[in-house]
Curated annotation (Swiss-Prot):
The gene coding this protein: slc51a
InterPro entries membership: Ostalpha/TMEM184C (IPR005178)
UniProt keyword Transport present: yes
Species lineage: Eukaryota, Metazoa, Chordata, Craniata, Vertebrata
Segments crossing the lipid bilayer: 29-49, 68-88, 100-120, 162-182, 199-219, 238-258, 276-296
SMART domains: Solute_trans_a
Protein name: Organic solute transporter subunit alpha
């Protein structure tokens, strides 16, 4: 009998992501323990966030409450969405879109937070009326040190806000548009050809993301010294870490899955398994970020001193030190 030279291929490796009940039935003891622990971590993240919201409503000035809640909620929301995507594999596209849309809003809210920490628009303009913005910063123009500084005016501040706000608005619009195309069968995350809608929409979102991150970086570079006592540097680091983990890490895993580097494991195809791994990693990472964020934002919210007050205090301390030496 002749034997043909071929490789057996499980047809389930080309199938869509499994239904939730099928994914649950194939779990072994380790899988059940893993899913339980990850679910508890996601739930704990949301409980910590709820407790933080209660603290913010009691202790934080009214004009800062909503902004801080939006910013501190990014990690718990991503943890919960990742948990839902882990349990319901076919809902991954929607949970990822929800997380990405929330983060787009947080990009704008973090810019507003830095301005509010200084005292709001009027206080910021009064404090920095003779200063300039350094626009030769990442992610757009970090390699262009020759760019001139821009005077700080109400108009330049509005342009910075608009640069971040457009991402929050357009991300929501494009998410709704993608869902409409998906219902018509015209949108698929696995179709990365030039004829597919996903590659064009995601590329456009990438450009909008870079444009939106630029104003936040410009504002951070300007206020980081004034807000150093308010832990603005680690807060900004957490914001950047969420960006890297939710966008870059997820994109790398998805690319590896599309290329077949991540092996198929029925009932999960390569792509579905890549999404599952991404969700599980994000739950752990967002849980840790939630705990760190709670420590950073749980403080007494008092106005920062004016520059004149700081200089006066330094002068008094210097005079007192000179008298003591004499």
């Amino acid at each position: 009998m002749e034997t043909s030279n071929f490789t057996l291929f499980d047809p389930r490796c080309r199938a869509e992501a499994p239904f939730a009940i099928d994914a649950i039935k194939q779990l072994d003891i380790f899988g059940k323990v893993l899913y339980t622990v990850l679910t508890l971590m996601a739930t704990a993240s949301m409980l910590v966030f709820i407790e933080e919201c209660i603290y913010i409503y009691k202790k934080v000035p009214a004009h800062k409450k909503s902004t801080i809640i939006w910013v501190t909620g990014v990690a718990p929301v991503m943890a919960i969405m990742s948990c839902l995507g882990m349990w319901v594999p076919r809902a991954t596209m929607f949970t990822d879109m929800t997380s990405a849309t929330y983060f787009a809003i947080v990009v704008f809210k973090f810019l507003i937070l830095m301005i509010e920490e200084v005292g709001g628009d009027n206080a910021f303009l009064r404090r920095c009326e003779k200063q300039t913005f350094k626009i030769s910063t990442g992610p757009c123009c970090c390699c262009c040190p020759c760019l001139p500084n821009v005077p700080i005016t109400r108009r330049s501040l509005f342009i910075l806000k608009l640069g971040s706000y457009q991402f929050a608005l357009m991300k929501l619009v494009l998410t709704i548009f993608s869902i409409v195309l998906w219902t018509n069968g015209s949108f698929s995350l696995t179709n990365v050809s030039a004829s597919g809608a996903a590659i064009w929409i995601n590329s456009f979102i990438g450009v909008l993301t870079i444009i939106a991150l630029w104003p936040v970086a410009i504002m951070f570079m300007h206020v980081r010294e004034a807000l150093r006592t308010l832990k603005i540097v680690p807060k900004y680091a957490m914001y950047q870490l969420v960006l890297i983990l939710s966008q870059l890490q997820t994109a790398i895993i998805n690319i590896l899955a599309l290329n077949g580097t991540i092996a198929c494991s029925p009932p999960y195809s390569s792509q579905a398994r890549g999404y599952m791994m991404s969700q599980q990693l994000l739950i752990v990472e967002m849980f840790i970020i939630t705990l760190v964020t709670r420590v950073l934002y749980r403080r007494q919210y008092e106005p920062i001193p004016e520059p004149d007050d700081v200089e006066e205090k330094k002068t008094v301390l210097s005079s007192k030190k000179a008298i003591d030496v004499a």
